[in-house]
């Protein structure tokens, strides 16, 4: 079966202990229910912790005896972490769990043209899995695919788009083919329109991770940020009263964006009280806006106040773009950022 395998990346780090309990229980309940939709889509903007949720639900299910097949896309490795690799990895894992499928997969893989993703899916997934009709729902593997929207990389060329469209086209079969409907598929991504077209909420379960103005004081998303920040600030050796005041100031500004909270914790770690005084954040409800404000504060604090305002804005824009892209960006991409404006500014950065 080795020839059938594809490249695979491990899932990211799980959620911190004690956080995301409400949403994890919701996902687990949907996975266990034979009557709910077979596709569970965890949706949210960058930085809210979708990948951590994918890792946590995998660990949680495996800890309760459920076999999980996981796969993670990464836009920086779009030439190897492909749709072809996804279905080959899943096929191989099914064979390890159900050796009787081996012959189906070996025969289906013969003469396969990697450009024909529909044939690959039918021969390695759709047809073989029909042999598992008699397996009880609670014993079937759960498939977890993280960062679905990163398939195809930045999609600057036709190959990236072709791979992404091939992925969506084959995934659509998951809700169309009767015998595939018994297999639970958990996916994570940003709320992209193309994915919504494939998986509208009429045929899939949408688990929306709130952010910005959707995060209210006292709700689970806000409390999760609070738990995370308290654990980080407590470890810095400062007095409890200061920790409480700092958390009360920071939590509303996070807007449910975990990458914001992580950046704050990293920034404060070396000199908490002094650096906290530099966090003159705007009172925005949108976590993404406060993230840019935070970057600006970090840059000013770390590099001194000799930078001009336009330079701070440009550096902040570049840092933000690379954070959300999760990879280095080339000059051609960065020059298009509105705050960079010129080659001279880009060279300065």
Give each language-model segment a name.
Residues 1-349:
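Conserved NB-ARC/NACHT P-loop NTPase core of NLR-like innate immune receptors
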């Amino acid at each position: 079966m080795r020839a059938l395998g594809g490249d695979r990346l491990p899932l990211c780090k799980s959620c911190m202990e004690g956080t995301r309990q409400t949403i994890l229980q919701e996902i687990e309940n949907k996975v266990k229910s034979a009557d709910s939709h077979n596709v569970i889509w965890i949706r949210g903007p960058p930085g809210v912790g979708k990948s951590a949720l994918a890792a946590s639900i995998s660990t949680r299910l495996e800890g309760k005896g459920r076999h999980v097949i996981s796969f993670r896309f990464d836009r920086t490795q779009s030439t190897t972490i492909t749709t072809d690799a996804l279905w080959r990895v899943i096929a191989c894992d099914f064979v390890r769990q159900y050796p009787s499928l081996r012959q189906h997969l070996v025969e289906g893989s013969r003469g396969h043209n990697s450009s024909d993703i529909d044939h690959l899916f039918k021969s390695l997934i759709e047809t073989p899995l029909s042999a598992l009709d008699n397996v009880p729902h609670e014993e079937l593997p759960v498939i977890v695919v993280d960062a679905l929207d990163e398939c195809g990389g930045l999609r600057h060329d036709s190959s990236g788009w072709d791979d992404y469209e091939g992925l969506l086209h084959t995934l659509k079969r998951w809700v169309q083919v009767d015998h595939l409907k018994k297999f639970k598929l958990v996916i994570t991504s940003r709320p992209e329109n193309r994915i919504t077209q494939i998986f509208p909420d009429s045929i899939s379960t949408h688990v929306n991770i709130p952010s910005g103005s959707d995060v209210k004081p006292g709700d689970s998303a806000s409390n999760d940020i609070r738990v995370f920040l308290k654990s980080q600030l407590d470890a810095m050796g400062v007095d409890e009263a200061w920790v409480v005041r700092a958390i009360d100031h920071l939590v509303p500004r996070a807007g449910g964006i975990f990458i914001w909270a992580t950046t704050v914790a990293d920034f404060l770690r070396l000199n908490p009280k002094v650096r906290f005084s530099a966090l003159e954040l705007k009172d925005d409800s949108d976590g993404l806006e406060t993230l840019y404000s935070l970057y600006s504060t970090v840059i000013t604090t770390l590099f001194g106040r000799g930078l001009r305002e336009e330079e701070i804005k440009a550096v902040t824009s570049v840092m933000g773009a690379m954070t959300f892209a999760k990879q280095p960006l080339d000059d051609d991409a960065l020059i298009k950022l509105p705050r960079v404006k010129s080659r001279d500014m880009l060279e300065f950065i």
